[in-house]
Amino acid sequence: DEILLASRLDAREADVGTVEDVDLIGLAAEECARVDADLDVSAVPEGLEVRGISKLLRRAIRNLLENARRYSTGEITVQVLRSGTLAEVRVCDRGPGVPLDQRERIFEPFYRLPGASERSGGVGLGLALVRSIAGRHNGSVHCEDHAGGGACFVLRLPLARAK
């Protein structure tokens, strides 16, 4: 499933869904409910919409949550906020974190952190797909330290234009 999606995203002209205004808070809430993650939208008093393909954005958030669940030893928190002209989804965990020198490599297809092969699940495509989906939406994704231990994956997407 992920390999097929990755190949379709590589062929950028491939039809992978309809572009529409997507309620990012609603999408994040649904995905957080699936894995019992805490969602914080306190920084966004009103809705937050991005222009994109709903099923791809859902997959990006789901992959970030599944990655956090796979490596975390504690709670997973998701924060959705506005940062200028961008929407930001921050998925933070209490896992071992990601060494600074690995923070770009983890987004390469099939790359896994040393020692990760012993953990259950995953083939090393999830984060590569997130980066590809972000790029298709003129956005970005990166990894940073989580205060108190762990990692935060930050997905940034352009906000939909006001109607």
Which positions does each model-derived feature cover?
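Short alpha-helical Gxxx[C/S/T] motif in the catalytic ATP-binding
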Residues: 126, 130
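Short beta-strand/loop element within the Bergerat-fold HATPase_c
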Residues: 75-85
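Acidic ATP/Mg2+-coordinating residue in the GHKL
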Residues: 93
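Short conserved segment of the HATPase_c
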Residues: 98-110
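Glycine-rich ATP-lid/hinge loop adjacent to the conserved G-boxes
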Residues: 111-121
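Conserved micro-motifs of the catalytic ATP-binding
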Residues: 11-17, 49-52
